[in-house]
Amino acid sequence: MMGKARKLVIIMCFVFLVCACGKENNESSEELYTGSSETASPEDGQDTTQAEKPKTNDELYRFILDKLIKNEVSEIYQYASDDVKVISEEAFERMLLDLKATFGEIVGIEDETSTVQKGISLYNVTLKYKNVDNHMVIYIQDGLLVGMNSDIRFRNSFDITYDNGVVETCFLLNSDGYELNAVYTHSSDMGDAVLLIPGSGVSDYNETVGLLTPFRDIALGLAEQGVGSLRIEKRTNRYRDEAAGQISLQEEYFVDYDNALDWLVNNSAGDIYLLGHSLGTQIAPVLAEQNEVSGLILFHGSARHLADIIKDQYAEIDPDNSDYYAQISEYVKTITEESSRGLYFYNAPDYYWASYNELSTIETIKKINLPTLIINSTADRQIFEEDVALWKDNLSEEQNISILVFDECSHFGYKIDTSDPAVLYSQQDFPEEILSAICSFINS
C-alpha cells in the first residue's frame, strides 16, 4: 500500500535483487570480460589517483564501469553525490560486491547507450553474468554519481547454495507467455511451503525497498526452520509498459500467482500456505478461495478499502485538502467495469479500481474458513489503528483465526523508524519473532 504521513524523496534507486551469502553451484566457464580499455593506466611513478581521476560525465561512467567489471568498487564511492551518500560507504560497497558473490564474474557487456535528461546523463548498459543479465542505468550529473539502478533478469535456471544448507533455485516462471524471475527457497528437510504475495505497485521478487529485501529475508528465515517458499517478481516489474493502461488485479496478481501456486503445488511435498503482505493480504484470500491451500498468513495489511487507506495517507500529509481526497475515494468505490474510461485516480486507472471493487476481504476469509494468522504492528506507518481494529472486530471470535500485534515492527517487518529515509539503505535483520510466529502457525 502507498506510503503514509510524509513525502519521502527517493534519492536513488539501487535495486539489487539477490544479495550475497551464497554462490552459484556451477563455476562459470565463460571468458571473463576484463574491462574497458578507455580507462588510462598510470605510467611508472605517476600518482594513481590523479592519473585515473575522470574529468567528464563520460569518463566517470567509463571509470565506474571499469571498477564494476574489475570488482574494485571501493574506488567508486568517492564520486558519489551527497544525496547518494545517504548510503554509508560500507553499505554501498557491500551492495555492489554482493553481485559478484551471488552471480560470479562479469563475462561481458552489451547494449551500451546514453542519453541526457534534465542535465543528468543516463548510461544504460547490460552486464552479463553466467546465468543472469544485469540491466543497469548509471546516473551522472556534473561529474558525480547521482543514482544507479540495477535490474536482474534470469537467463537460465541455477542454484544458490548457502553455508547452512539452504538452497535457492532461481528460474523463469512462464506465466501465460510472460517470463518472470522466480526463486524457490528450500532445504533438504523441507516439507510445507509458502507462496509470498507482495503489496501493490511495482515489486521485484524480493519486494525490495531501498536496500531492504523483506521477502528474501522471510524466505531464508523460513527455510532455516524447514519451511520452503516461492517468490516471483510482479508482471508490473518486468513488463511495465505493457502493464500500463487497462491493468486490473487479474494482470497484476491473479493470473501470475495462480500459475506460481500451480508450480509450488507440483514441486513441494507438504501443505501449501499463502503469505500476503500489504495489499497482498486482500489478494491471498481470493487465491485461497480458488485453489486448495492449507492456510493464510496476512502480514501487515488491512481489510479496509484501499481508497480509504490512501485517502487517510494523503489527508495526513495534506490536511487542507482532506475533503477533496474523501470525495475521490467515495467516487473510486463506485467504479465498475462498465463505467471505466481509462481515467486515473490515486495513480491507478479506473479499470484497476473496477476489479478491486469486487474484493470483499472479511467476507471471503469467513467463507473459506481456513486457518489464518494475521500479523500487524502498532509501529506500521502505512496503516492506521482502525485497520488493526477492523481485523479484531470482525475476526477475533473465529476459532481458526489468530491475530498478533507487535509493537516495534515497520510496514516491511524490520524494527526501523521509516521517518528517516536513510534507514532504508542500511543493513537490517528481520525479526525472529515474526519468523517464529509464522513457522509455529504452519507447524501447528
Identify the meaning behind each predicted range.
Residues F215-Y239:
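Conserved alpha/beta-hydrolase
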Residues S188-L222:
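Short, surface-exposed "cap/lid" segments of acyl-processing enzymes
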